[in-house]
Amino acid sequence: MNEKIAILSTYSFVNIEEPANLIPKLLLIGKRKYIRGTILLANEGFNGSFSGSYENVNLVLEELIKLTGPKDVNVKINYSDVHPFQKLKVRLKKEIVAMNVDDLNVDLFKGEYIEPKDWDEFITKQDVIVIDTRNDYEVEVGTFKSAINPNTKTFKQFPAWVQQNQELLKGKKIAMVCTGGIRCEKSTSLLKSIGYDEVYHLKGGILQYLEDTQNKNNLWQGECFVFDDRRAVTDDLSPVERHWLQR
């Protein structure tokens, strides 16, 4: 019986002084371990999704952690019958998720995590507003019932939406949500940097929430857009064909 391919997704906001120096080291171990996928490196941290045997993807993750020294690392592993990636790429970027805001220190300055098991109770409180930080075509497929859709085409538009909606956010506990956690985590840092104190985000994002809770209270409506060959998943994480989403 053939071994399943492990697909490891990970990110961490951690200060990396010379991220370019890590590229040859990660390429070396990745190629030796037959890893495919992409790892993005920046001064603000790392963001990667790569595939291989379970043992080998974890060896690459261990090397990445050893080289960067993060306090918190977000990791999720799924499985597939085939590699979803063609080759290994390790790239240097200005940001690991592009927002185009300078001088954000997400590692030290971000909101509080809300665990998936506590999310439903938290977002149904009167003084909490939920903001879906994903792009409009993702929100269109599915979102939380109470979530505000900023109607952004790219994540780079989100800071402008925040500036234009100060009154909406004033005096509220703000709960951020996104697919896997990285965009909502960076969004909380943006809000903290401009003076909002009570800012929160869903740990592990929508996918972790659906896996952990099975949407038992039906606060999630629709499907969840994902950036791979599945295109969208239902609330039990079953894949859905969505050819019209390829835009």
From Swiss-Prot:
GO terms for molecular function: oxidoreductase activity, acting on paired donors, with incorporation or reduction of molecular oxygen. GO terms for biological process: tRNA modification. It catalyses: uridine(34) in tRNA + AH2 + O2 = 5-hydroxyuridine(34) in tRNA + A + H2O. Gene3D superfamilies: 3.30.70.100, Rhodanese-like domain (3.40.250.10). It is an enzyme of class 1 (oxidoreductase). Belongs to the TrhO family. This is tRNA uridine(34) hydroxylase. It comes from Rickettsia peacockii (strain Rustic). The gene is trhO.
